[in-house]
Every structure is written in structure tokens, then in C-alpha cells.
């Protein structure tokens, strides 16, 4: 069984259990911030900074992290958005992390999870997310389209994550505003930064925002993403392990590169 299959099996169990529960995030009025608007106004590569305690590929990264403290550091360093891992079993995150972060910052917050059901989208929105992630590798195309439509009707922005040319082809059938190209193969967890370069050339970047995800460590990595047509990068482990956060942010915030199809 692949890593992804194992995660999805567990996620289905979680969803089934969740439907028997009632979660109350309280009466709050968290404004929905537009990530798309921020990206389109930026003159340099935008950065989505991720809060990630652990992962199946890296094990424990920083288990004792205070998500609010880390989120505030990210915002002060210049993050355009914050990604919060909410998967509990494999990434040691939670919806409580998402709620606390969304209340503490004034930039968009992404709920990063393996979403397979509408109830997860409801929970993400209720906890304060303004963006969610839908992974093509985790969903049949028809189900992906249903969840995409459901999320956008709730006023959420959606990152459609792909890793292969076939997934990208399927994603483009719904003309998404944002495509996330994951350099990490979710079946093997291997990383190849050339994935963004190879897939981005198939996307009209005048119509669709590209985000390069995974493996971003150096200015050269960020430059490769920008030259490939990405307007943003998602960075997790590099920042979670950083002892010089502001410096690392500045290194990765490279100029945008105009590219036409």
C-alpha cells in the first residue's frame, strides 16, 4: 500500500467518525482574505509558509511548536498566506491549530489536509480557513469537481494540487484559478523540483496562478519555480527548521518572471 493510499484509508475512517460528532468553533467573525488578490498584486514570488509538526517522510520536525507564535513570525517575515496542516494521524496537526492561527493573523490561511468530503470543507471554513487544498491524486475526477464546486460556493478559494500531466489535464477541465504543482510524489514521497518546470509549461499563467509546492530550500529553487511560471511557493520544513527565518524568507522571495504561453 502506498503512503497516499494509507493516508486516504485513515481519512475515510476519520470522516465517518466526524459525521457522528458535533464540533463547535464558537461564534466568531473571521473575515475571508483573498489569496488570489494578494498574489495578483505582488511584484515578487509570494510565499505560503506552512506550520507542520511532522510528516510521514520526515518524521517529527518540531512537535512542540506553538502554532500561533509561529504564524505571527511568518506574517512578520512577509508571508502572503499561512498553511496549517490539520491532519492529526500523520502530520500531528489539528483544526484547533487552524482556528487559533486564523484568529491571530490578518493574511489568508490555508487548510492543508486530504479532503475527501464536504464535511471537511465545512470544518475548514468554520475554523477560519479562506483557502483549501484539493488533491487530484486523492479523488476521482467527478468527486474532485463536486468538492471544488462546493468549496467555491462557500466562498473559499481552492488550490487544485497536481503532480502528473494527467492530473493537470483533469484539473484544467474546470478552469481553476489556482493550480498547485507538488514536486513531491505522494505515492513514494520522492521530490523532484523539475516537476514544476515540466508541468507549468502546459498552463496559461495569464489565467491561472501556479504555486510550486515542496522541496523549496534555496534561492535557486525559488528562482527555478519563478522562471517556470510560478507566482508563489509553499514552504514548510525549511521554515520549521529555520534558526534565521527572516533571512530564509528574503532568500526565497525572488522576482517574478513574466512568461507567456
Swiss-Prot record:
Pathway: Amino-acid biosynthesis; L-tryptophan biosynthesis; L-tryptophan from chorismate: step 4/5. It comes from the Bacteria. The keyword Lyase applies. CDD domains: IGPS. Belongs to the TrpC family. NCBIfam families: PRK00278.1-3, PRK00278.2-4. This is Indole-3-glycerol phosphate synthase.
